[in-house]
Amino acid sequence: MTRSTSSAPSQRMLRVGEQVRAAITQVLQRGEVRDPLIEKTVISISEVRMSPDLKIATAYVTPLGVADHAAVIEALNKHAKFIRGRLGPQLRQMKYMPDVRFRDDTSFDNYQKIDALLRSPEVSRDLDPDTDDQE
Protein backbone atom coordinates (compact mmCIF):
# COMPACT_ATOMS: atom_id res chain seq x y z
CA MET A 1 0.00 0.00 0.00
CA THR A 2 1.47 3.34 -0.99
CA ARG A 3 0.87 6.59 0.79
CA SER A 4 -0.48 9.53 -1.10
CA THR A 5 1.75 12.58 -1.00
CA SER A 6 -1.00 15.00 -1.98
CA SER A 7 -2.25 17.50 0.54
CA ALA A 8 -5.91 16.78 -0.18
CA PRO A 9 -7.78 15.52 2.87
CA SER A 10 -8.87 11.90 2.93
CA GLN A 11 -12.52 10.88 3.10
CA ARG A 12 -12.00 9.89 6.73
CA MET A 13 -10.53 13.30 7.60
CA LEU A 14 -13.50 15.02 5.94
CA ARG A 15 -16.05 12.78 7.68
CA VAL A 16 -14.49 13.17 11.12
CA GLY A 17 -14.09 16.92 10.57
CA GLU A 18 -17.79 17.23 9.84
CA GLN A 19 -18.66 15.21 12.96
CA VAL A 20 -16.41 17.41 15.11
CA ARG A 21 -17.95 20.54 13.54
CA ALA A 22 -21.46 19.34 14.40
CA ALA A 23 -20.41 18.46 17.96
CA ILE A 24 -18.74 21.84 18.58
CA THR A 25 -21.80 23.59 17.16
CA GLN A 26 -24.05 21.75 19.60
CA VAL A 27 -21.80 22.64 22.56
CA LEU A 28 -21.89 26.32 21.60
CA GLN A 29 -25.64 26.34 20.86
CA ARG A 30 -26.46 24.82 24.24
CA GLY A 31 -24.45 27.58 25.94
CA GLU A 32 -22.20 25.16 27.80
CA VAL A 33 -19.20 27.50 27.59
CA ARG A 34 -19.49 30.03 30.41
CA ASP A 35 -17.84 33.09 28.92
CA PRO A 36 -19.77 36.35 28.51
CA LEU A 37 -18.19 37.11 25.15
CA ILE A 38 -18.98 33.66 23.74
CA GLU A 39 -22.48 33.59 25.23
CA LYS A 40 -23.53 36.88 23.62
CA THR A 41 -21.93 36.17 20.22
CA VAL A 42 -23.44 34.14 17.41
CA ILE A 43 -20.62 31.95 16.13
CA SER A 44 -20.71 30.21 12.77
CA ILE A 45 -18.37 27.25 12.28
CA SER A 46 -17.79 26.91 8.57
CA GLU A 47 -15.28 24.08 8.54
CA VAL A 48 -13.19 21.82 10.75
CA ARG A 49 -9.97 20.51 9.23
CA MET A 50 -8.47 17.42 10.79
CA SER A 51 -4.78 16.57 10.87
CA PRO A 52 -3.88 13.30 9.09
CA ASP A 53 -3.58 11.48 12.43
CA LEU A 54 -6.96 12.93 13.56
CA LYS A 55 -5.43 14.31 16.76
CA ILE A 56 -5.76 18.02 15.91
CA ALA A 57 -8.96 19.71 14.79
CA THR A 58 -8.72 23.25 13.45
CA ALA A 59 -12.13 24.92 13.52
CA TYR A 60 -12.65 27.91 11.23
CA VAL A 61 -15.19 30.20 12.85
CA THR A 62 -16.88 33.48 12.01
CA PRO A 63 -18.22 35.51 14.94
CA LEU A 64 -21.31 37.34 13.66
CA GLY A 65 -22.22 40.81 14.86
CA VAL A 66 -18.89 41.44 16.59
CA ALA A 67 -16.23 43.80 15.31
CA ASP A 68 -13.37 42.25 17.30
CA HIS A 69 -13.04 38.73 15.89
CA ALA A 70 -9.66 38.26 17.59
CA ALA A 71 -11.18 38.57 21.07
CA VAL A 72 -13.79 35.89 20.30
CA ILE A 73 -11.16 33.56 18.80
CA GLU A 74 -8.96 34.10 21.86
CA ALA A 75 -11.88 33.30 24.19
CA LEU A 76 -12.68 30.13 22.24
CA ASN A 77 -9.04 29.01 22.36
CA LYS A 78 -8.99 29.73 26.10
CA HIS A 79 -11.91 27.32 26.55
CA ALA A 80 -10.66 24.76 23.99
CA LYS A 81 -9.88 22.09 26.60
CA PHE A 82 -13.35 22.41 28.11
CA ILE A 83 -14.94 22.17 24.65
CA ARG A 84 -12.76 19.14 23.88
CA GLY A 85 -14.08 17.46 27.03
CA ARG A 86 -17.67 18.14 26.02
CA LEU A 87 -17.11 16.47 22.63
CA GLY A 88 -16.52 13.05 24.21
CA PRO A 89 -20.12 11.85 24.48
CA GLN A 90 -20.86 12.80 20.87
CA LEU A 91 -17.65 11.34 19.41
CA ARG A 92 -17.46 8.02 21.26
CA GLN A 93 -16.25 6.17 18.18
CA MET A 94 -12.94 8.05 18.11
CA LYS A 95 -9.87 6.48 19.65
CA TYR A 96 -8.44 9.87 20.61
CA MET A 97 -10.32 13.08 21.27
CA PRO A 98 -8.73 15.73 19.03
CA ASP A 99 -7.19 18.93 20.39
CA VAL A 100 -9.38 21.76 19.16
CA ARG A 101 -7.89 24.96 17.79
CA PHE A 102 -9.96 27.89 16.64
CA ARG A 103 -9.02 30.16 13.73
CA ASP A 104 -10.78 33.11 12.12
CA ASP A 105 -12.46 32.13 8.86
CA THR A 106 -11.51 34.66 6.21
CA SER A 107 -13.26 32.92 3.31
CA PHE A 108 -16.34 35.16 3.60
CA ASP A 109 -14.14 38.28 3.45
CA ASN A 110 -12.42 36.84 0.39
CA TYR A 111 -15.81 36.20 -1.19
CA GLN A 112 -16.83 39.81 -0.58
CA LYS A 113 -13.61 41.11 -2.17
CA ILE A 114 -14.11 38.94 -5.26
CA ASP A 115 -17.75 39.99 -5.49
CA ALA A 116 -16.78 43.67 -5.27
CA LEU A 117 -14.19 43.17 -8.01
CA LEU A 118 -16.70 41.46 -10.28
CA ARG A 119 -19.16 44.31 -9.76
CA SER A 120 -16.57 47.02 -10.41
CA PRO A 121 -17.16 49.18 -13.51
CA GLU A 122 -13.96 47.99 -15.19
CA VAL A 123 -14.91 44.33 -15.02
CA SER A 124 -18.55 45.03 -15.87
CA ARG A 125 -17.42 46.89 -18.99
CA ASP A 126 -15.25 43.91 -20.01
CA LEU A 127 -18.10 41.47 -19.48
CA ASP A 128 -20.76 43.55 -21.24
CA PRO A 129 -21.55 41.91 -24.63
CA ASP A 130 -22.66 45.24 -26.17
CA THR A 131 -19.14 46.71 -26.03
CA ASP A 132 -17.74 43.86 -28.15
CA ASP A 133 -20.06 44.75 -31.04
CA GLN A 134 -18.93 48.38 -31.14
CA GLU A 135 -15.29 47.58 -31.88
Swiss-Prot record:
GO cellular component: cytosol
Protein name: Ribosome-binding factor A
Record key words, sorted: Cytoplasm, Ribosome biogenesis
PROSITE patterns: RBFA
Native source species: Sinorhizobium fredii (strain NBRC 101917 / NGR234)
Entry's Gene Ontology molecular function annotations: ribosomal small subunit binding
Gene3D superfamilies hit by this protein: 3.30.300.20
PANTHER family associated with the record: RIBOSOME-BINDING FACTOR A, CHLOROPLASTIC-RELATED
Major subcellular site: cytoplasm
Function statement: One of several proteins that assist in the late maturation steps of the functional core of the 30S ribosomal subunit. Associates with free 30S ribosomal subunits (but not with 30S subunits that are part of 70S ribosomes or polysomes). Required for efficient processing of 16S rRNA. May interact with the 5'-terminal helix region of 16S rRNA.
Family of the protein in this entry: Belongs to the RbfA family.
Keyword Heme belongs to the record: no
Presence of keyword Iron-sulfur: no
